Amino acid sequence: MAGTSRNVRVLVTGANGFVGSHIVSLLLSRGYVVNATVRRQTASEKLIATFACDRLHVFVIPDLTSEQALDEAIRGCKYVVHVASTVPSKEQASGIDIDSAISSIESVMNSAVAHASEKVVLTSSMSTHLDVKAPILNESTWYTPDRSSTKLMVQYMSSKTLVERRAWELSSTLKLPLTTVAPVYIGGPTIIHEQDPKSSVSNQDLLRCIEDESRSRIPGWIDVRTVAHLHLHAIEDHSLNGRRILACTHNRGVVPMDCSLMNSLLAKDSAALIDFDRTKRDLLEQIDAFNSGQTRRVVA
């Protein structure tokens, strides 16, 4: 795989995020050249310090929605992975700017066409598949967005759904291949230099779940490293063009999900499948190390 990836350039937006940084790490390990975008200079410095690789090129782009914002970063990129997005925390005061999120995917898709990129992979969310009337979630199910809601999680789910819908519209009109990866809650270690492993919103939920899983209503989990591998498959496997990969490896049975596409990919890539116990163990060990062993250990 690394042989075919040599000198192939990939754009990764949101490269300093929990998922984005793992995608960058995997791409670099496979020989790709990575053009990474971040919003702030401090994030750029941490990304460079983390990987220290001459095949990583970091671009500070505060606003992906601005016209031609990606022109320099996307130049020469065969593939584009659009990760940039955040899961809202309960402490977040302001709502989610849905229009900006839609403008960002429009900017990414239009720039990809303008610079002859061959494919876009979009990090979506299980919530985009969440049709409450469907007996099981699958590639064809969709959440019904509600832009009028003041609830932060509804805004998030609506935003992710409207962004993905817009991406598919543009994929069709621009004749640009698209694959989406839609994970459930994501857990695991962080890799950015000096980043607190508890800083990820998903990891905060995972820690609460570990402390008392019986009280958790979270539908399922997947390891962040497995999510990165699914993005790599989406880049490299052209049979996945036009597909929506629903990703959950630890389904708690709260919401029935058809993850057969994901399972078929992981069956070919056994190293990518990280079980839930390892996710918990690796996260807890990293938290202990980050806090110099002062954190109370939670035994799963």
From Swiss-Prot:
Tell me where on the tree of life, at the top rank, the source sits. Eukaryota
Q: Does the keyword Methyltransferase apply?
A: no
Enzyme category, top tier: oxidoreductase
Q: Which residues are listed for NADP(+) binding in this entry?
A: 14-20, 39, 63-64, 83-85, 156, 160, 183-186, 199
**Induction entry:** Expression is strongly induced under conditions of nitrogen starvation. Expression is positively regulated by the cluster-specific transcription factor rua1 that recognizes and binds to the specific 5'-T/G-G/T-C-G-C-A-T-A/T-C/T-C/T-G/A-3' upstream activating sequence found in all promoters of the UA biosynthesis genes.
Q: Which InterPro entries match?
A: Epimerase_deHydtase, NAD(P)-bd_dom_sf, NAD(P)_dehydrat-like
Tell me the active site. Answer: K160
What EC numbers are recorded for this enzyme?
A: 1.-.-.-
- Molecular function GO labels: nucleotide binding; oxidoreductase activity, acting on the CH-OH group of donors, NAD or NADP as acceptor
The metabolic or biological pathway listed in the UniProt record of this protein is:
Secondary metabolite biosynthesis
Report whether Methyltransferase shows up as a keyword of the record: no
Q: Which Gene3D superfamilies does its entry note?
A: NAD(P)-binding Rossmann-like Domain (3.40.50.720)
Keywords attached to this Swiss-Prot or TrEMBL record, sorted alphabetically, are: NADP, Nucleotide-binding, Oxidoreductase
What does the sequence similarity comment in the record state about its family? Answer: Belongs to the NAD(P)-dependent epimerase/dehydratase family. Dihydroflavonol-4-reductase subfamily.
**Function text:** Fatty acid hydroxylase; part of the gene cluster that mediates the biosynthesis of the glycolipid biosurfactant ustilagic acid (UA). UA is a secreted cellobiose glycolipid that is toxic for many microorganisms and confers biocontrol activity to U.maydis. UA consists of 15,16-dihydroxypalmitic or 2,15,16-trihydroxypalmitic acid, which is O-glycosidically linked to cellobiose at its terminal hydroxyl group. In addition, the cellobiose moiety is acetylated and acylated with a short-chain hydroxy fatty acid.
**Name of the molecule in the record:** Fatty acid hydroxylase uhd1
Instruction: Supply the source organism for this entry.
Output: Mycosarcoma maydis
Report the gene name: uhd1
